[in-house]
């Protein structure tokens, strides 16, 4: 696999890397997500050279993605893919799991992770308060 070969080649040469990972994107299947977790696990031998930044998919106004979602409350959106509906709670769960895995393996994570988590925790709380789950 070319990605794994590239990581190994960079790691052997002590070249720093940044992983910019997006979870919960519209076409992401459970298998895709599990491959992301496998990448994090596999790459841990080079964890001192890797900074990981993981973000949940979010809708930006006036983008093509905005056309392919619907709101289940004022602030929250979801969409369907082959695995079913992917709502904010599931995107958050994937984001949190991937970040916790990265932390448990000793990776350098995005410096503002704690602030990002606080903001997403607030959004998740509001999601549960306003959604019909």
Residue ranges and their predicted role:
Residues 1-133:
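A structural motif corresponding to the C-terminal lobe/cap of the Radical SAM core domain
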């Amino acid at each position: 696999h070319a990605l794994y070969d590239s990581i190994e080649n960079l790691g052997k040469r002590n070249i720093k890397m940044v992983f910019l990972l997006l979870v919960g994107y519209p076409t992401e299947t459970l298998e895709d997500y599990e491959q992301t977790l496998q990448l994090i696990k596999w790459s841990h031998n080079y964890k001192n050279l890797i900074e990981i930044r993981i973000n949940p998919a979010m809708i930006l106004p006036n983008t093509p993605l905005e056309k392919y979602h619907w709101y289940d409350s004022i602030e929250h959106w979801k969409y369907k893919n082959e695995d079913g509906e992917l709502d904010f709670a599931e995107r958050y769960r994937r984001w949190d799991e991937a970040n916790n895995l990265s932390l448990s393996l000793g990776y350098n994570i995005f410096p503002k992770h704690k602030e990002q988590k606080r903001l997403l925790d607030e959004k998740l709380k509001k999601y549960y308060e306003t959604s019909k789950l």
